[in-house]
Regions:
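Intrinsically disordered, low-complexity Ser/Thr/Pro/Gly-rich regulatory segments
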Residues: 1-305
Length: 305
């Protein structure tokens, strides 16, 4: 359903909203419980209702724009959380009891509970994350690194298991949960995002990856010319970080010329942070749609500070 919706939806925030709600999880097999936040909602049982709601948001995006503007964020993970919060507040059979609830001990914040929900299946503490991991040369979670090479899939899963998910069960959380009339909260997580595979080399998916996970490729700056030559005449351009969720849709006036891309490449520093670029194809309406995405990393990656 997501593919068909993205052919119709045009508002960037609503496209990101649709991707957030409907894209597959990164992992299908996990040691900790993974639960879609809308699992018990009629929007999951009757997806046309969700599609209709998203179409309404696209025709009048004032509500989602107002929601996002009420608490502006610069980090992609927080933007992802805000989109989830907007949808869950609108879902007809899900109650958002609290979001980003701080848990403190002697005045010191131990952490925050991303979401506390109530639905037909009970009370839930959910941790949300969206991640972009680049594979090196193995199937272990430790072989999949964030674009900055500091984050790793195994570290994220460990942090979820050892800190984030148990937080709602700690003694320090009981008072806050009791005040919200939450007594038997079950913890779970939802991990969205993309896995990027090396070019020109090959890498297998990490253990437990969902077969239909969102994916791309990554390459070093030194390999760009060879990579670009595999799709001659293609239109490539970088995306700003907050535009990394849904596949890009760019109108004719926003597409870069070959000269603009070359100028950007010429000014890209050798030690630059990883850049996300998309390859765009023109559709029959004259819009340009993403058909491929790649991370361009510096030639020292992942050995960088």
């Amino acid at each position: 359903m997501l593919h068909e919706l993205l052919l119709r939806l045009r508002t960037p925030a609503v496209r990101d909203l649709a991707w957030t709600l409907l894209s597959p999880p990164m992992l299908g097999e996990t040691t900790q419980v993974q639960r879609h936040p809308l699992q018990a909602s009629c929007w999951t049982r009757q997806p046309q209702q969700l599609a209709d709601w998203l179409a309404q948001q696209d025709s009048d995006a004032s509500a989602v724009h107002a929601w996002l503007a009420s608490k502006p964020v610069r980090r992609l993970g927080l933007y992802y959380e805000r989109l989830w919060q907007f949808a869950l507040h609108a879902a007809p059979d899900v109650e958002v009891v609290a979001a980003n609830l701080p848990i403190r001990q002697n005045g010191q914040t131990l952490g925050e509970l991303d979401l506390l929900l109530r639905d037909d299946e009970g009370e839930h503490h959910l941790e949300l994350a969206v991640k972009f991991y680049l594979g090196t040369d193995g199937r272990e979670a430790a072989d999949w690194l964030g674009p900055g090479s500091h984050d790793r899939l195994d570290l994220k899963l460990s942090h979820l298991a050892q800190h984030q998910l148990p937080l709602s069960s700690r003694r320090e959380a009981r008072g806050a949960l009791h005040d919200l009339q939450l007594d038997e909260t079950r913890s779970a997580f939802w991990l969205g995002g993309y896995l990027f595979y090396p070019w020109p080399h090959y890498s297998s998916s990490p253990h437990g990856a969902t077969p239909e996970h969102c994916r791309g490729r990554w390459l070093h700056q030194r390999n760009w010319s060879d990579f670009a030559s595999t799709s001659p005449g293609a239109h490539w351009q970088p995306l700003p970080r907050l535009a990394w969720l849904a596949p890009a849709l760019i109108n004719a006036g926003g597409v870069w010329s070959d000269e603009m891309l070359q100028q950007w490449l010429n000014t890209l520093r050798p030690e630059a942070q990883a850049q996300l670029l998309v390859r765009l194809d023109e559709d029959r309406a004259g819009d340009w749609r993403e058909v491929e995405r790649v991370f361009l990393v510096n030639d020292q990656w992942p050995a960088q500070s």
